[in-house]
Design a protein with these regions (language model features):
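Short, contiguous acidic and Ser/Thr-rich linear segments
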Residues: 1-7
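Fe-S ferredoxin-like electron-transfer domains
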Residues: 36-233
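Residues in well-ordered alpha-helical elements
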Residues: 7-10, 157
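A basic, amphipathic helix-loop patch mediating RNA/tRNA/ribosome contacts
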Residues: 9-43
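Residues that form or flank phosphate/diphosphate-binding pockets in enzymes
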Residues: 4, 33, 200
């Protein structure tokens, strides 16, 4: 692939029309590298190789070997001669594991979710052979239908903490109105004290959400994406 100086792996692939699975990365935002969905195998570079013991069928014993380290494609810059695989066995297994963790507490309410039909969670679940989660316990419950402003509603249970909305407000709208609180599976997006989401780019904040966590009051429960027609943007 051709690339420009400073391009990361995922951006270089994106320029060529190749999609590496991702949630938190967006071409117009800073790099967060927190979803770990874009893990890829980087080969033929010694610093990227991990020493392991591998079974040798001929010798019938374990021998010293190396395997590619998994690296986030959104964070690693491309170099000449770099050998990258996003579809290798280790990369696909890592992506499937990330997907499983994200779905542990995610409500399976796709039939009523406004993001259904254009949801990355749905797309990647289908891409990873529709694997079921192995943890059979009550999911963590969080606030639902939280009013974030005159036009936006937030569902914390659907949120995958990609921080796209937070970064968009900070970097594009220049309004630090969204933030994160708590940790682990209690993590959620919150409003700054005394504020609400009402800047000039409010609906674009909803648009960059890859799942159905941020929804528009005007659209909510009123239409499905497959009934809509596309039109050129401004």
């Amino acid at each position: 692939l051709s690339f420009q100086p400073g391009d990361t792996i995922i951006r270089a692939a994106w320029r060529q029309g190749i999609e590496i699975p991702h949630y938190c990365w967006h071409p117009g935002l800073s790099i967060a590298a927190n979803c770990r969905m874009c893990l890829v195998e980087i080969k033929a570079q010694r610093p990227m190789m991990l020493p392991i013991l591998a079974w040798d069928e001929k010798k019938k014993e374990y021998v010293d070997a190396v395997k590619p380290k998994l690296q986030p494609a959104c964070q690693i810059e491309v170099t000449e001669g770099m050998d990258v695989s996003s579809t290798g066995k280790q990369a696909v297994e890592a992506q499937a594991a990330v997907q499983e963790f994200l779905l542990l507490n995610h409500p399976v309410d796709c039939p009523i979710c406004d993001q259904a039909g254009e949801c990355k969670l749905q797309d990647y679940w289908l891409a990873h052979q529709k694997k079921l989660k192995r943890k059979d316990t009550e999911p963590v419950h969080k606030p639902k239908a939280v009013r974030f402003g005159p036009t936006i509603v937030y569902d914390a249970e659907r949120c995958i903490m990609c921080t796209r909305g937070v970064r968009f407000c900070d970097e594009v709208a220049k309004d630090h109105v969204l933030d994160m609180r708590e940790r682990g599976n209690r993590n959620e997006i919150t409003l700054s004290p005394g504020r609400e989401l009402d800047h000039d780019y409010t609906l674009m904040t909803e648009h960059v959400c890859p799942v159905g966590a941020l929804t528009s009051k005007d659209f909510r429960f009123k239409a499905r994406v497959w009934f809509l027609r596309s039109a050129p943007g401004v």
